[in-house]
Each structure stands twice: as C-alpha cells, then as structure tokens.
Amino acid sequence: MKKQSNAPQIRFQNFEDEWVNQRLGKTVEVIMGQSPDGKNYTDNPNDYILVQGNADMQNGRVVPRVWTTQITKLAEKGDLILSVRAPVGDIGTTDYPIVLGRGVAAIRGNDFLFYLLSRMKQTNYWAKFSTGSTFESINSNDIKSAEICLPSQDEEAAIGSLFRTLDDLLSSYKDNLTNYQSLKATMLSNMFPKVGQTVPEIRLDGFEGEWEKVKLKDVTESIEYGLNASAKEFDGENKYIRITDIDDVSRKFKEDSLTSPDINVSECDTYLLCEKDILFARTGASVGKTYLYDKKDGKVYFAGFLIRARIKDKFDSKFIFQNTLTDRFTQYVKVTSQRSGQPGVNGKEYGEYELYLPKYEEQQAIGTYFSNLDNLINSYQEKISQLEILKKKLLQDMFI
C-alpha cells in the first residue's frame, strides 16, 4: 500500500482511507465552565458535584471532592472534562452529572476523542496558546478552533477500544500493586516486634519462642564508609552506587543513568559490594534509606555518603534489611539524625540500632516471605512501566 499523506504511522488492518482535517468545535459540543458563588460550596455528597480543575480528577476520572448547591454549567455522565487552566490540557471523564467550574470545560466526545486529547496534552499542543502569558490558560475559541484529524467512525471505535483496553489493564495492574504494597506495609508492622514487645503479632506457621534483642553491630562483620571519588561515565563494567541511585520506594539500584567511580578500581576492592551487604544513607534528606546488594546488579562500588554493613554469615541479610523498612527503624533514624546542620547518622550510631532476632530458620523464612512479596511488587511496577511506554508510543503513532 502506498504511503498516505494524511494517515497515522500505525493502523489496524482493513482501514485505508485518509483521515479528514477538522476543527474540534465543528465535531463536538464544547461547554465552558462557570464557577458557582463560593458561599454555595458544600461538603454534602447529596448536593451537586463541583469540578474546578485537575485536582478533581485522578487517573483520568472525576473524583468528587467539593459539592455545590448552585448550578451554573452542567456536564453529563460520560462527558470528557478538559482542564483549561494550569496545568492546561489534562483530560478525564466523569461517571456522574457535574457542575463545571471555570477551570474546566466539558466535551461531548467518545473514547477516540479522549485519547486524541490525551495525545494533544502529550505533545504540548495547548502550550502555544499560553506563550507569553503569566498564567497558563486556554479559552473557548482555542478549544473549538483546535485542529484535529478524524478517521471513519469504525476506525475511531477500534482505536478507542484498544486504548480503553490498555487503560483497563493498567488500572488492574495499579490496583494489584497498591494491594501488595498495602499488604507489605501491614506485614512489616505486624511481623516484627513493636516497641515494648519481644515477639511479633503475626508469625509464620511452625515458629515460636522469644526473640533476642541485639544491636546492628552485633550482627555485622564490619560497618564501613564508602569510596571518596567522583563519578564518571559508565565504563561498561564497574558500577557506582550513590544515595540518589537507590530508588526511594523499591530500594532497588536504579540503572537508568549508570556511572563508574573516577578512580583506579583495581586498588578499590575494599569498596566492592558482595552478598549480605546492606548500604545505609548517612546524611541529608535521604538519611536512613537502605539498599540490600543483589548479585544481579553486577560489579558495584559504593560511594562516600553511604555506609556498608556486612552481615555475618549466621544471620539472614534479607531479614536484617527488612528490619530497616519498619517504623521502629524509621523512628530511630529520625531521633538519631538530629544535627545542628543537615540530618545525619554515622556508622557508630547505625551500629547501636537495636533489633530483635528469632532463630536463624525463622529469619530465613521471614526474609524469603518479604523477598517474594518484593518480587511481586517489582513485577507489577515493571508491567505498569512497560504498558505506559507502549501506550505513549501508540498515542504518538496511531493519531495525527
């Protein structure tokens, strides 16, 4: 098939007609918002839902937050809701009849148009209308005169259905991720002893007996500071981990911008991480952030604002690491890190952290339980990331 001048790069089979140029206002009805008087705002869910801007939308849906007794401009269930004030172009749909505030407009469109408007946001289409303005906004004429390209109704339906399926799958993955993250938070709270307790509230089957109180220094071979070297471009083998390279949520080594230590690494074996090593951030806003070395991360040297605790063989490093994610540890860091300048915890202070240990077999079981839970969480995070990349690519290539 010959290349067409007015067709997207990616199309479903059996669709060959060129797309038609059109103005948005000639295609659908656009309703600009008008805010009610502030005195008529309420928190009563029996009143009319008021949508004023993107703060009233989450994940592409209107989420009731404010109500009003005064009707100004109305949107119907199923309408598309476009943010017309900073940030301009955010788009959502409403599952309810709503009152439109002046920060939004309603568009009577379908799934295809929803994703077309999503692409326009992605490509900064609306930015040209706010150039030179101190307050980013678009008006009725900007919206109605927006230039769009439309396929046949059948192709619109096919494209809209594809993206709706993608979004439903994304929503499902995000729900699962949230559920597993909530489960982990609950288990961290209940599978380690709380303050004043010597056993946890929840234990795995087959284990009993008191846990022993120890200090972090009792379970480590050494507690050492990192390498005093700047970072350079990644050499393909020797990785350099700094505080910012530890993901705040997953506590995994982020490899999106790898670097190497700017030093002769043949003389730096002391700073090379190995299994059972746990890193602790020692200063700044990230103090207390931890990372458990994973051999899959390869050859990794650790930087000077990190402290390494090398766990003794007779203790389970996964169990010790999960201890550093508990409220007890967070509270210890909060109290200990108080300084006249920026917060910090040194190696000796980390070594004084008190924790409770069960027998080795139970340590292993708990460490494995949380490791498996982390793997589930990471798998959903990866699926979400991959789907979002795919969606962004398809938005770019399936529209004009």
What are these regions (language model features)?
Residues 9, 128, 145, 172, ...:
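The feature marks the first
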